[in-house]
Curated annotation (Swiss-Prot):
Organism: Haemophilus influenzae (strain ATCC 51907 / DSM 11121 / KW20 / Rd)
Enzyme class: hydrolase
Catalytic reactions of this protein: P(1),P(4)-bis(5'-adenosyl) tetraphosphate + H2O = 2 ADP + 2 H(+)
InterPro entries xrefs: ApaH, Calcineurin-like_PHP_ApaH, Metallo-depent_PP-like
PANTHER family in alphabetical order: CYTOCHROME C5, PTHR40942
One Gene Ontology term from the biological process aspect of the record: RNA decapping
Protein name (Swiss-Prot/TrEMBL): Bis(5'-nucleosyl)-tetraphosphatase, symmetrical
Amino acid sequence: MATYFVGDLQGCYDELQLLLERVDFNPTQDKLYLVGDLVARGDKSLECLRFVKSLGNAAQTVLGNHDLHLIATALDIKKVKPRDRVDAIFNAPDFDELIHWLRHQPLLVHNEKLNFLMSHAGISPDWDLKTAKSCAAEVEQILQHGDFHYLIENMYSEQPDRWSPDLQGLARHRYIINAFTRMRFCYLDHRFDFACKSPLKDAPAELTPWFNLDNPLYKQIPIVFGHWASLVDEPTPKGIYALDTGCVWNNRMTMLRWEDKQFFTQSAVKNYSDF
């Protein structure tokens, strides 16, 4: 049995299949973890959704910002962006089933046996393990069983940009969603910056990646995440695994085998900007 992690798919189905063939993935024995953003911009988002769903217990994904946006468009809260190339999902006979399944995916996975945390964007620099898990569960409960329409309709905000345990209601839930699905750079006082998406060397001096801030949790448990394609080939601290290597931006898809920490890569098989 082997455990694999793979970076953002974003509709890049063919590259995923090539990686799974290369590692001889066996869904009856192996497990595949996905860091979220299964959909958007690639040409086979529908195939990605159907495939991951079809794996059942052999796969586990987390929600990414593009996944949440797809749910928002399915609820008629947001309009479909042509560049996202998700029309096939909306025309699919299993559309409702796929959106229901996606909405029931977690924001955070903590595997105590294999000793890892996985989310789409990372873990807030102000959270310990207990807080991260309770915050994820709080929003997951609403998305899966509560007034998810109201939450998704009101989640689009960059405020609050700093954590406080006193946050309540929508402000609290916005921060939680942004931490798990949108976070990249932070100020030294731990405020989020959502404007900068550049490589580390080009970032303003006052900004630092979330994983370089002082949080004991970052050294206690390995963290696997995606979301940040411009981190490709950038060094990260020990135990911090950045797996989004920009396949949909014509770079490559990255897979990590957990047991021996071996990486596998697959270059984009097509120029997605040509579509």
